[in-house]
From Swiss-Prot:
Belongs to the TRAFAC class myosin-kinesin ATPase superfamily. Kinesin family. MCAK/KIF2 subfamily. This is Kinesin-like protein KIF2B. The modification Phosphoserine is found at residue 204. It comes from Bos taurus. PANTHER family: KINESIN-LIKE PROTEIN, KINESIN-RELATED PROTEIN 6. The lineage of its organism: Eukaryota, Metazoa, Chordata, Craniata, Vertebrata. GO terms for biological process: cell division; metaphase chromosome alignment; microtubule depolymerization; microtubule-based movement; regulation of chromosome segregation. The keyword Cell inner membrane does not apply. Gene3D superfamilies: Kinesin motor domain.
Amino acid sequence: MASQLFRPLTPRLSSLTPVKPHFGHLQAGISVAIQRTDGRIHLAVVTEVRRDNAWVTVEWAEKGVKKGKKVALETIFLLNPALALAGPAAQGRASRSVSLAPPSVIGDQRTAARWAGKIPQRNETPSGDSLAVRVPSSPCLMTQRKSACLREIEKLQKQRERRRRLHREIRAQRARDADTGNAHYEIRRLIEECRRRLRGGRISGPEPRDGRRICVCVRKRPLNRQEATREDLDIVTIPSDNVVMVHESKQKVDLTRYLENQTFCFDHAFDDTASNELVYQFTDQPLVESIFRHGMATCFAYGQTGSGKTHTMGGGFSGRDQDCSKGIYAMVAQDVFLLLKTSAYEKLNLKVYGTFFEIYGGKVYDLLNWKKKLQVLEDGSQQIQVVGLQEQEVCCVEDMLNLVELGNSCRTSGQTSVNAHSSRSHAVFQIILKSRGKLHGKFSLVDLAGNERGADTAKANRKRQLEGAEINKSLLALKECIRALGQNKSHTPFRASKLTQVLRDSFIGQNSSTCMIATISPGMASCENTLNTLRYANRVKEITLNLRPRHRCLYPAEREMPRVLENHIRNSEMSLQGDEFIRIPCLQSEEEKETEGIKVLSSPLVDTTISWKEASQWPDNKIQDTSDEVNCNVDFCIAQLLSILEKKIDILTEIRRKLKLLQADIQKENRHGEVNGERSDLK
């Protein structure tokens, strides 16, 4: 029976004549193995070979239905590697390995089953009438040709894997170099890189201060024990003796952290290694001699609570005890008594008095008289007087220190979440010089209470919160006064609080000289408060003091200090290096010629020209050298140029005004001369 079934097959196979293959041995009419979409592999008959686009059309029967599909040439060669081999031997092997499906068996289920039985089967059996083909366990597959789209996808995948591998290496290197225990180790790394760049560039020193402007200095304290415990970062850098840079941490939309460096320029800047002696040398010591010449000097410390104001003014703490001999109070007293013994001031027969009072809750209390309540009033000459304030005469430095210790013991203080020894009041210590019972000079040392945020005192009791609100209210009033003075407004709200009333003469009083010490905290948690303090101090820097012309000799630029203070400065631990400036020759020669020509016509212009000569010393050599550096700090250069320009604009505006007045006077005199000449001609 089997011989009868396969009898027609032999002549049919023998009648096939070999045809010269195209695209290898692939041609129409042969059976090839194809793969279906569901993964099944079976035989199909090639009906058409498209040479133009390398496609092959195949057909097969399944459940009595003829089906067909188009298969790529690469796919045919992948499943039928023998078709691509060349040579007669390969052709013979191909004819043995590839079977042709007889057309007569298509449609007969039993014949198709027996035909399929002669062919080695694959694991998955095709359904219907389709024939299965065995794929060799280790076939000799051809390399499949890849399309351009597939090659581009593989290229992108390789690039993506290379980037990921590089990022993994970078993260591993950062983990090895950085302290992963700190949550802000990435910000620390950025700050260290910024500081390394700053060390490579040249930083210029402080510029000479104009005597009519408030001296503003900034002091940075070191990280305290509480900040070190929580591993807070130091975000404040002082690259030179008059520049402060704050590294503010920012975050992009993609959560990438970066630094925004904000630069401020002041008269002096002290880092966390500076001592109280160094701070005093460049802040209060130049003002001590002014009170011996009928001057009113003031120094006030401003800053966030816990930033070191009381430490600077009164001295350091050892537990709850304060060493008053290391503060600015004691240093001013020492220099006052030193100058009293000099020959220049000994003949004045001056007596020294001390007062100490505080402003707490909007009220004034005398710290040397059992905290007696005082009143701040204005007399007929519009001078602020503290009524009932007790003045105690002192004869030596030890007596002055006793007053300071007595006042500090009575001063209102408390403990907050930010500072264990927080001052809850504004303290004013005054050193008064009197000659024959009349006021000769006065030095006021003001230790302001620290401004507080509501978030810092949210867990405090009601008393502490009310104290913080009152402190912020008085400091806000002081800020509004400073803003009004900086904008030259007609009204300055000094009566808004007791603090501004007491400090009014320091800003607008005659013969006043003022110094501000802004203390800042270096911790990252205090970044917002630090920036507010620096902006506050930057606005104070623009205020011009009201000086009388007859007392201009009090603060000349080349004034020599007495030898006693000179030796004291020479013996200090360190000194700030001043800049060497150059003059502009063309401007100087022109101004000298103009001064000689108009000296008789306008005497006020001479003073303006002299001040312009002093101010025309531009530090262009320093700025040029800094800009020539490869790693120069652009923010620092811009801040320095803006600081220089702000100082020159006021002088140039005044010169222009005087020149216009002079021009009008000359034109007026010329018109009068012409009229007089015409009258003489008529006569």
